[in-house]
Amino acid sequence: MIAHLTGLVGQMESDRCVVDVGGVGYLVHASTRTLSALPRPPDVTRVLVETVVREDAFLLYGFAEAAERDWFRLLTTVQGVGAKVALAILSALSPGDLAGVIAAADKASLTRVSGVGARLAERILTELRDKAGRMPAGPGVTIAAPPASGGVEADALLALAGLGFRRAEAQPVVGRILARLDGKADLDVVIRESLRELAR
């Protein structure tokens, strides 16, 4: 199994990037938090990797810090939490915030995450309640997305800045997208749509 990759940062999207190691490009899925922490292409980076082998695919999930990787592993032990949902949770909540949410049984914070309904949030809280206290909090900076559109806008701009876009060029695009979606889109949707427009 692959434990980490060290190489050149290549193409970046809202939920993945390419890491070029010795001329081989590895497609690495990651949270917006990890993508924001990576240097701009084509700088060198090192990402921790969790390898997931499925019947039809061999997938790599990358993390800027060990705490996020460990939480990814723990989250995916919960029935109904696949890799995509785990990354969505880790995009919205830092490891420290997630530990706090579980300790406080804060279901509302979990249900704000795309793909997490009330029933799944309850299952996460129940199954991880006794394990969360032993998990690393990590040094990550909180960029959780609150339900108000102002918070989504600020977090989207932070993520886009981490992907190399200047605030001056990203802010009008994010504003238009939020207006078009009536301010109700979640963070992942706003980042994805913004990248689509900025790439034109």
Curated annotation (Swiss-Prot):
Q: Kindly list the GO CC terms recorded for this protein.
A: cytoplasm; Holliday junction helicase complex; Holliday junction resolvase complex
Drop me one GO molecular function for this one: four-way junction helicase activity
Keywords assigned by UniProt, alphabetized: Cytoplasm, DNA damage, DNA recombination, DNA repair, DNA-binding
**One GO-annotated biological process of the protein:** DNA repair
What's in the domain note?
A: Has three domains with a flexible linker between the domains II and III and assumes an 'L' shape. Domain III is highly mobile and contacts RuvB.
The similarity annotation says: Belongs to the RuvA family.
- HAMAP family, A to Z: DNA_HJ_migration_RuvA
Q: How does this protein assemble?
A: Homotetramer. Forms an RuvA(8)-RuvB(12)-Holliday junction (HJ) complex. HJ DNA is sandwiched between 2 RuvA tetramers; dsDNA enters through RuvA and exits via RuvB. An RuvB hexamer assembles on each DNA strand where it exits the tetramer. Each RuvB hexamer is contacted by two RuvA subunits (via domain III) on 2 adjacent RuvB subunits; this complex drives branch migration. In the full resolvosome a probable DNA-RuvA(4)-RuvB(12)-RuvC(2) complex forms which resolves the HJ.
Its job: The RuvA-RuvB-RuvC complex processes Holliday junction (HJ) DNA during genetic recombination and DNA repair, while the RuvA-RuvB complex plays an important role in the rescue of blocked DNA replication forks via replication fork reversal (RFR). RuvA specifically binds to HJ cruciform DNA, conferring on it an open structure. The RuvB hexamer acts as an ATP-dependent pump, pulling dsDNA into and through the RuvAB complex. HJ branch migration allows RuvC to scan DNA until it finds its consensus sequence, where it cleaves and resolves the cruciform DNA.
Q: What is this protein called?
A: Holliday junction branch migration complex subunit RuvA
Protein species of origin: Gluconacetobacter diazotrophicus (strain ATCC 49037 / DSM 5601 / CCUG 37298 / CIP 103539 / LMG 7603 / PAl5)
